[in-house]
Swiss-Prot record:
Pfam families: Glyco_tran_10_N, Glyco_transf_10. The gene is FUT3. It is an enzyme of class 2 (transferase). Its main location: Golgi. This is 3-galactosyl-N-acetylglucosaminide 4-alpha-L-fucosyltransferase FUT3.
Amino acid sequence: MDPLGAAKPQWPWRRCLAALLFQLLVAVCFFSYLRVSRDDATGSPRAPSGSSRQDTTPTRPTLLILLRTWPFHIPVALSRCSEMVPGTADCHITADRKVYPQADMVIVHHWDIMSNPKSRLPPSPRPQGQRWIWFNLEPPPNCQHLEALDRYFNLTMSYRSDSDIFTPYGWLEPWSGQPAHPPLNLSAKTELVAWAVSNWKPDSARVRYYQSLQAHLKVDVYGRSHKPLPKGTMMETLSRYKFYLAFENSLHPDYITEKLWRNALEAWAVPVVLGPSRSNYERFLPPDAFIHVDDFQSPKDLARYLQELDKDHARYLSYFRWRETLRPRSFSWALDFCKACWKLQQESRYQTVRSIAAWFT
């Protein structure tokens, strides 16, 4: 035995123990910090609550978005993006072409350039790093000269769900609390079926279907050459009907327009749809929120079904159960532009769309 072993001092062990305790304390503080930071960055659209502390993160410059034209050359009211969805980023959005050299993004609405695209596109040379967005809410038959746009655009923005920026005509969102609307007042539904149509083409699929349907069922048609529908009275008029013919003028994937989201759902009428497939509609709506013409072998069978629902209140009301948890929302130009703003905030890579025509048609 080493005679000096009994006399070996103990303080090095105390120092090691103190060091271990200190490291443990540092680790606890570090992981607590990580947990709080992760909670603050969940991606929730809500702004951080009760945030009185100063943020030391450098402020990111506000991005500048230029509208090449107002949609259909009609100015629209713009809102701050952070007011539309609290907690989200803002951009400066303008139609003033003088800011073109400084713009981070240019939104080009196809309808307003399609008569002569190359002469109506933004001028060359394009500022370095500037992104161009092809924006369109019309179906392929209404979009001419797409082939002239090859390799000009960086992002797509449309009603198609496979767009870089998805801008549907409407959507459903959960109620934040209890539904704010009263139950459906059936006594106010004094009429059966309505259809408001402005673009009447006798050889179109929807007009042909209507003509077969109305041989078995009374349908009140509003619009040119039909019943007048004074401006400002549309919702009041359509709200009297139990069913609304949400017949699209073109049958293409995801092309589900205001005919359903506004004319039918905002009027609390059950939509009878003619458009893409039932499975396509069910990507955006509960299966019991609408009636699809494809569910019936003939317009006569559909007419019989609507007449049955008219007499069976319980079955008719079953088409409104989804409203207990969901509510319909309709698009706005301002919100669509804000979606482009948020995409620009998130998307760092620079890409080029080789062919708009090959993708969209």
